[in-house]
Amino acid sequence: GGKVAVNISAGKNIIGAFHQPALVVADIDFLGTLPDNELRNGLAEALKHAFIGENALFELFEKGDFDSIRKAESLMEIVYRSALFKSSVVERDEREGGLRAILNFGHTVGHAVESLLEYRGISHGQAVALGMAAELEISVRAGLLDRAHARRCTELLERYGLRIRRAGLDVDGLMAHMKYDKKTSLGRARFALLSGPGKPVYDREVLDDVVRAVLADTIVTGG
């Protein structure tokens, strides 16, 4: 996608630029050598694409399971469809003036999780999975998405071994880190959400009280 950035203690990807690569290499044989947890990290982003509009991927994930998608032909399909979907969005909005913001689904909360944990003890993919779980529920409470479809999505996250709750998070800490999100405007986070199956919306403001309640009810757990 061309984004290059660094993380600082206040937040993720706060300092960055756009610089397109000369070449992108996707080696399916290499993917096959990865341990399960690293493969799941990549699947989190592929599942995001499935949720926000890559309908063939959604169908593939619903029909399969973690063992079945480890096969080379399935990995090829997932990588191909994910790359095609993302590039089609980036080509229309390289510098994120609008449409490209749909790719941030799961990342407003997900980046806050990573920042709160100081980028230790959690992978980006797992943080995004937690973010999607929370932002699916925000979509429901905002009246955009029916609960049945939100549940279909969270069930897929769990089926592929991605956690949707985590100990060690606290609502106040997450809210504080979201204030530094690059999508924040006038001190309030802006979200990419779902308005239906494969129908993302972006730049949505959500009341802090709603976000707090969702975090407490979804991804934050004691212990």
Task: Give the ranges of each region predicted by the language model.
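C-terminal charged capping/lid subdomain of soluble metabolic enzymes
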Residues: E38, A44-A46, L144-G223
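A generic hydrophobic-helix recognition signal that picks specific residues
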Residues: N13, Q20, L99-R100, A189
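A glycine/threonine-rich phosphate-anchoring loop and its flanking beta-alpha core
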Residues: G1-F66
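Active-site segments that bind and position negatively charged phosphate/pyrophosphate groups
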Residues: E59-D172
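Double-stranded RNA-binding/processing signature
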Residues: G32, S68, G98, T218-G223
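Short, acidic Gly/Pro/Ser/Thr-rich loop/turn segments
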Residues: L31-T33, E54, G110-H111, K199-V201
